[in-house]
């Protein structure tokens, strides 16, 4: 496979260096830990600190959501691997202004374990850290055990809304509460058309046959709900939207925000083709689309596919979603 790589074993380090140089007006590397990137103005006096983190390979997640009125720091892991507990701890300490720290991350075993270890270590230093995990992946666990679901593209809404609440002076508990409310009202589904390949491995870590698609695939290639024959885009879009709405069960007349993310190798043109039918389906269900985000928001290296995320809104979530924000991955 042909790639723009120096040494595959050091691609994350090279990427972080480039990211920080390109966005030096917003982010910088932590002096305490090279695997922590923080907002240039962090810690912000009088504000709850916000931290996220996760494995590399999902860019712009997670680096891209550090910035003004967004996350204050990110712990950076190797490709598809959790950041270390030390990286999370150093991220917490780098953004604490005395108001506590909210850690908002996706629901994966390694992240859960390392965040909890870091929280215990921070507590010994007198820093209070509370957390919320994104659990939006409808394909990863049944509705009855939603707390076991993985976090995928829905994390973007959690970061945007949590960041806005903190920027507006919310307390730690208020930030945690609104982040959890966002998670509780967010559902996502992914469809994969072709696999991804980790640079150091050099070949795909799973296969999708030509003419097939994997419905409900995970962001690391986790098996989906099933493998199906490839369909026209309008049929795929409707199947994705139906899967999300059937699980969410929003009341008729509800307003929603929609995020359509490519998975790394998907032309933006095709995301708009999908979205055209997604909105038509949502309107048929009596839903009103309030805000739309289309592009690469949470990817999976070079996987060809798409993620659909829907957030059911209320007045508070609408206000926070609209609040000014600027980071490499999103600007409002």
Give the label of every model feature segment.
Residues 1-50, 315-332:
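N-terminal amphipathic/basic leader segments beginning at the initiator methionine
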Residues 2, 48-55, 71-74, 100-109, ...:
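Short glycine-rich or small-residue beta-strand-to-loop segments that form or flank ligand, phosphate
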Residues 58, 67-98:
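Glycine-rich oxoanion-binding loops at beta->alpha junctions
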Residues 74-79, 123-148, 285-289:
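Short, acidic/small-residue loops that bind anionic groups at enzyme active sites
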Residues 112-126, 145, 270-276:
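Short Gly/Thr/Asp-enriched flexible loops that form oxyanion-binding sites at enzyme active sites
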Residues 134-174, 178-185:
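Short alpha-helices
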Residues 168-273:
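Mixed-charge interfacial surface used for oligomerization/domain docking
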Residues 243, 248-332:
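C-terminal non-catalytic interaction/assembly regions of soluble proteins
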């Amino acid at each position: 496979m042909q790639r723009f790589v120096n040494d595959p074993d050091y691609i994350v380090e090279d990427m972080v260096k480039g990211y920080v140089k390109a966005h030096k007006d917003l982010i910088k590397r932590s002096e305490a830990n090279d695997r922590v990137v923080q907002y240039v103005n962090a810690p912000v006096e009088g504000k709850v600190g916000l931290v996220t983190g996760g494995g590399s390979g999902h860019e712009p997640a997670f680096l891209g959501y550090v910035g003004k009125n967004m996350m204050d720091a990110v712990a950076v892991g190797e490709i598809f691997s959790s950041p270390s507990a030390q990286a999370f701890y150093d991220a917490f300490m780098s953004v604490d202004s005395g108001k506590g720290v909210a850690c908002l991350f996706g629901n994966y075993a390694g992240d859960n374990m390392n965040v909890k270890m870091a929280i215990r270590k921070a507590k010994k230093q007198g820093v209070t850290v509370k957390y919320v995990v994104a659990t939006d992946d409808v394909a990863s666990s049944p509705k009855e055990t939603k707390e076991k679901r993985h976090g995928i593209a829905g994390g973007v809404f959690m970061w945007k809304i949590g960041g806005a609440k903190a920027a507006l002076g919310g307390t730690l508990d208020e930030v945690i509460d609104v982040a959890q409310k966002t998670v509780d009202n967010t559902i996502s589904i992914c469809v994969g058309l072709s696999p991804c390949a980790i640079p150091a491995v050099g070949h795909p870590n799973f296969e999708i046959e030509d003419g097939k698609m994997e419905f409900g695939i995970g962001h690391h290639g986790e098996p989906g709900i099933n493998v199906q024959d490839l369909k026209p885009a309008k049929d795929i879009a409707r199947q994705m939207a139906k899967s999300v709405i059937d699980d969410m069960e929003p009341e008729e007349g509800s307003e929603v925000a929609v995020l359509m993310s490519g998975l790394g190798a998907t032309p933006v043109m095709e995301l708009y083709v999908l979205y055209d039918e997604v909105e038509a389906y949502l309107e048929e269900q009596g839903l009103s689309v309030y805000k739309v985000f289309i592009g690469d928001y949470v990817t999976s290296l070079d996987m060809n596919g798409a993620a659909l995320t829907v957030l059911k809104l209320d007045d508070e979530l609408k206000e926070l979603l609209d609040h000014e924000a600027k980071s490499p991955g999103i600007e409002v």
